Amino acid sequence: MSKKRKWDDDYVRYWFTCTTEVDGTQRPQCVLCNSVFSNADLRPSKLSDHFNRQHGGVAGHDLNSLKHMPAPSDQSETLKAFGVASHEDTLLQASYQFAYLCAKEKNPHTVAEKLVKPCALEIAQIVLGPDAQKKLQQVPLSDDVIHSRIDEMSQDILQQVLEDIKASPLKVGIQLAETTDMDDCSQLMAFVRYIKEREIVEEFLFCEPLQLSMKGIDVFNLFRDFFLKHKIALDVCGSVCTDGASSMLGENSEFVAYVKKEIPHIVVTHCLLNPHALVIKTLPTKLRDALFTVVRVINFIKGRAPNHRLFQAFFEEIGIEYSVLLFHTEMRWLSRGQILTHIFEMYEEINQFLHHKSSNLVDGFENKEFKIHLAYLADLFKHLNELSASMQRTGMNTVSAREKLSAFVRKFPFWQKRIEKRNFTNFPFLEEIIVSDNEGIFIAAEITLHLQQLSNFFHGYFSIGDLNEASKWILDPFLFNIDFVDDSYLMKNDLAELRASGQILMEFETMKLEDFWCAQFTAFPNLAKTALEILMPFATTYLCELGFSSLLHFKTKSRSCFNLSDDIRVAISKKVPRFSDIIEQKLQLQQKSL
């Protein structure tokens, strides 16, 4: 990291004064045109160059007076005394607004001074004239400035979220997942769900690197230290949902053990999306071998540059639409469904290409039994994709997610009965290639066995139907049979009173379930609290998955040393920075530093 330069009073001879950022960084600001430069420009050669080139090296005011004059951003009246109009507030606002858009679009910080500002100056000169261009020139948009602005906006957004967490009438829900970036650095990302103004809000919390290792204790320490750093008690967390895909975040991991030890009341849930990857564990040997053959074929094509180029040229030559395959080692199961569909639809062309390359994969790939297994797998994972897609949204709670899983599993017996009768309607790819009764017999037996194993797996892993009968009033307090509630249940009176209100019935019919119960906090606090404790926990790590997609935009080869947290927060947070407060605080801080 480069050493920060410091202001010297002798620099006033070039008609510059000093501005100080929130972090203490000093930057030179021209009194004559209000331009703010980076800390790296805080040296005589740079300041003299600007003074001579932009202002002709002549200024008609007393330097001794200038030494005691604050920066233009601090006292506009002082500048007016020197005949210089101050636009610092609007310049700062423009600078912050651009930095905000830069982060939202996930652009490099240098895009402002290298591309946007030069283009804007040219446009201003052509369309509006030199006066407009001169005003636009004063907007500070250097790399350092944009970086500083984003940091400040990130801290303001974080402060808003922390204030909301402290004010939430109910313990918050946490969503936690881990991924590895392009530098093989493990990144831990967290989102939070809390109640604010009669609705459940989901917000980005943090994205931090795991510096030493990826053990459960390291994850827990990072998680705990975030709350300690911001002076929030850890027991504000009522639930935590993990991706469940790795040992450190799995059901029996160290992380879960440490969390439960520190917060005994916490509800731990596991993502109902990612564990679908475990479906592969239920595949019989022949089906698993077929899947691994697909993996090897794609890696043969995509994993070797010459093969990949030849593959693209081959498909262009024969005029086939699909010419790009995803890199397919141990893929996420969601991609697996899409890939298997593409492989099945391109089967003949891929087979020709393997023959063309004299690959030893040909024998397994063109086997008739393999193609039948491929068709079944493509159909099966397409169904799984549709299930996953139905749960990939914000606001998904564990009750709704488990209902979708339960509905999916209930289809299995119908599929099994149809398959036993050689009816493959639910598996269109398979139906397309089954041409003889003998082929239908052997695959029907395999499928019915696998669907039974899959059904057992879903019931065991996802605990389908967790909501007991006595708690189903949460889903519909008006149609629910109140006799199911025990007479000693203190909230039975509240339920009876709530059901008698026509206005509340109208609210129930027009509002989302979570928002409805949030709205009842004032009139029926016990009912609302009980209902929301069940609806609050995250059901998936979908938000983290979206966050990881943003991480890929930020962490590129040209920005591999980039500190992610602040930019990601500004980019994906729903909150908008309080620009007026940030600018006012900045001006006050600069004034005090003089």
UniProtKB/Swiss-Prot annotation:
Note in the entry: May be derived from an ancient transposon that has lost its ability to translocate. Exhibits a close evolutionary relationship with ZBED5, but does not contain any zinc finger.
Listed name of the protein: Protein FAM200C
CC per GO annotation: nucleoplasm
InterPro entries attached to this UniProt entry: RNaseH-like_sf (IPR012337)
